[in-house]
């Protein structure tokens, strides 16, 4: 069988992923011109490469239409419930670091932890006749973190279609759940991350779709071992 590896199609993620596969003895070349979205691995005739966006990679992995992919852990865990039953996180690759965090306005001086935020959420409806509004693109991770891990139920999620960090200032939400690398954008928008408000430390991962056909395919384990050895 042919094994398909989905890799980022552009930018730093593409360069970093390609460098790791190069070190793993799996040099990748595009098939056709530089704009091609197909590739091959030199010396690995039973492996093909598809160049996709990070969000496309996570979707194709979750649906099992590719065998391996390099994408952010945040995208996988947001995209699918019980994701570990669908995929295996084979290796964390050491690039694409970012945290999914809970951030509140800096002027909320008495809110430093999720417990503090729980108190605010409970009091919010009585004071404002509405639930605490959270702007985010990460509704699944937000629900799991607030409701399951911290027992906070009195909130509503506002889908963020643009710059999430601007939502509190614009009045479209009270707080946010967003991804950040340095925190500088949050600080520029007068937001602070709660002390225990990191939902996920994310980075780029080598992810394998769980397929029964992989059990009898030696190249699957060979790919995993080669990449791990290159880290």
Curated annotation (Swiss-Prot):
Entry-linked Gene3D superfamilies: Periplasmic binding protein-like II (3.40.190.10)
Cellular component terms (Gene Ontology): cytoplasm
Classification via InterPro entries: ATP_PRibTrfase_cat, ATP_PRibTrfase_CS, ATP_PRibTrfase_HisG
GO molecular function: ATP binding; ATP phosphoribosyltransferase activity
Domain of life assignment: Bacteria
Alphabetically ordered keywords of this record: Amino-acid biosynthesis, ATP-binding, Cytoplasm, Glycosyltransferase, Histidine biosynthesis, Nucleotide-binding, Transferase
This enzyme's EC code(s): 2.4.2.17
Pathway: Amino-acid biosynthesis; L-histidine biosynthesis; L-histidine from 5-phospho-alpha-D-ribose 1-diphosphate: step 1/9
Catalytic activity entry: 1-(5-phospho-beta-D-ribosyl)-ATP + diphosphate = 5-phospho-alpha-D-ribose 1-diphosphate + ATP
A biological-process GO annotation: L-histidine biosynthetic process
EC main group: transferase
Compartment(s) where it occurs, according to its Swiss-Prot or TrEMBL record: Cytoplasm
Pfam families with a match to the protein in the record: HisG
PROSITE patterns linked to this entry: ATP_P_PHORIBOSYLTR (PS01316)
Recorded domain comment: Lacks the C-terminal regulatory region which is replaced by HisZ.
Subunit structure: Heteromultimer composed of HisG and HisZ subunits.
Function statement: Catalyzes the condensation of ATP and 5-phosphoribose 1-diphosphate to form N'-(5'-phosphoribosyl)-ATP (PR-ATP). Has a crucial role in the pathway because the rate of histidine biosynthesis seems to be controlled primarily by regulation of HisG enzymatic activity.
Family designation: Belongs to the ATP phosphoribosyltransferase family. Short subfamily.
Name of this protein: ATP phosphoribosyltransferase
